[in-house]
From Swiss-Prot:
Nucleus in keyword set: no
GO-annotated biological processes: glucose homeostasis; sensory perception of chemical stimulus; sensory perception of smell
Protein name, entry field: Odorant-binding protein 2a
Residues of the signal peptide: 1-15
Disulfide bonding pattern of the chain: C74-C166
Highest rank taxon of the organism: Eukaryota
Subunit comment: Monomer.
GO molecular function: odorant binding; small molecule binding
Gene Ontology cellular component list: extracellular space
Upper taxonomic lineage: Eukaryota, Metazoa, Chordata, Craniata, Vertebrata
């Protein structure tokens, strides 16, 4: 019985991992809604966001690239997301951040959910993303359910202004 359970579990894990790789997670994603935990400073919440470009690096690893303005300068941020044993789970910054990618059923949208370990504490952030900048109300409702399931408050969901990528200075 244990052997059968182990076989089914490993098969399911392999199937889930295969599904995530098969579904094209690469490309441009538009941030439609965000949520952060209550400990996240209000003044650090992004009011404007650029699209996120996800690139496959091989071996199941991904790179997420986006730009933002800081003190009138365009800054580009690249995050190396290393594949873990758990399907849909990636680590970044030496394991300090754990990033989960979850497709929302019945939509073309995903949730990028992040646990960030800082100075002995944990911070949580979630992003509802899609292939186009239009907000899908079904996906937004699913995002709200997921937010509550993760222990975050629906009241902390906000919709930043979607902008284009800024131009880097050379």
């Amino acid at each position: 019985m244990k052997t059968l359970f182990l076989g089914v579990t490993l098969g399911l894990a392999a199937a889930l991992s295969f599904t995530l790789e098969e579904e094209d997670i690469t490309g441009t994603w538009y941030v439609k809604a965000m949520v952060v935990d209550k400990d996240f400073p209000e003044d650090r919440r992004p009011r404007k966001v650029s699209p996120v470009k996800v690139t496959a690096l091989g071996g199941g690893n991904l790179e997420a690239t986006f730009t933002f303005m800081r003190e009138d300068r365009c800054i580009q941020k690249k995050i190396l997301m290393r594949k873990t044993e758990e399907p849909g789970k990636f680590s970044a910054y030496g394991g300090r951040k754990l990033i989960y990618l979850q497709e929302l059923p019945g939509t073309d949208d995903y949730v990028f959910y992040c646990k960030d370990q800082r100075r002995g504490g944990l911070r949580y952030m979630g992003k509802l993303v899609g292939r186009n900048p239009n907000t899908n109300l079904e996906a937004l409702e699913e995002f709200k359910k997921l937010v509550q399931h993760k222990g975050l408050s629906e009241e902390d969901i906000f919709m930043p202004l979607q902008t284009g990528s800024c131009v880097l200075e050379h």
